[in-house]
């Protein structure tokens, strides 16, 4: 599938989701948010989705990046589940989730080099880091206008049930279906 800049049906769903976040969304006492807060707090960092939700509640809007990115971001804010998207064709070798020993380095989406923090969760392939929970995905496997095959990963704290994770990934699929007539989708949950 060809990554598109935007899709009118997806833009309409964005406006609906923005309205829901502004009018009906309540993050008070949310166990998903609390799980992420606990992880980020260890490093005196804040859970980025919480900030993004507050921005929309104050009148902000979803950005227009591309259909492959926007579909993921919408599901992230709806479900509060941190997700990374990767160009599957740029991944080299096996994927390995691990806990950082500290100092592993990679280049983030913004082009800055970043060292992983000891104890953070990371993902790597045969060439190096693809993402960390604290600092996000690497530029090397980022979704670009040329991306044809995408891998979405939900980064979940302990305690989020499989049903919620599967529902989150199905929301991404549903968003993509607004733009693409045919999709080849596989959903797997690995703990």
List where the protein language model places each region.
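Non-transmembrane, aqueous-exposed alpha-helical and coiled segments at domain scale
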Residues: 1-191
């Amino acid at each position: 599938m060809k990554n598109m800049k935007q899709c009118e049906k997806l833009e309409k769903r964005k406006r609906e989701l923005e309205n829901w976040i502004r009018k009906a969304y309540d993050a008070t006492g949310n166990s998903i948010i609390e799980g992420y807060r606990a992880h980020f707090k260890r490093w005196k960092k804040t859970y980025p989705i919480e900030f993004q939700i507050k921005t929309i509640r104050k009148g902000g809007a979803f950005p227009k990046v591309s259909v492959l990115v926007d579909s993921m971001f919408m599901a992230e804010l709806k479900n509060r589940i941190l997700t990374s998207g990767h160009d599957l064709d740029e991944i080299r070798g096996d994927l390995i989730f691990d806990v950082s020993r500290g100092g592993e380095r990679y280049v983030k989406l913004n082009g800055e080099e970043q060292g992983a923090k000891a104890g953070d969760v990371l993902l790597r392939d045969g060439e190096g880091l693809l993402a960390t929970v604290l600092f996000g995905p690497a530029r090397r496997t980022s979704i670009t206008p040329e991306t044809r095959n995408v891998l979405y990963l939900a980064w979940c704290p302990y305690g989020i049930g499989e049903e919620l994770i599967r529902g989150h990934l199905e929301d991404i699929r549903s968003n993509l279906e607004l733009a693409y007539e045919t999709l080849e989708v596989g959903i797997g949950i690995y703990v």
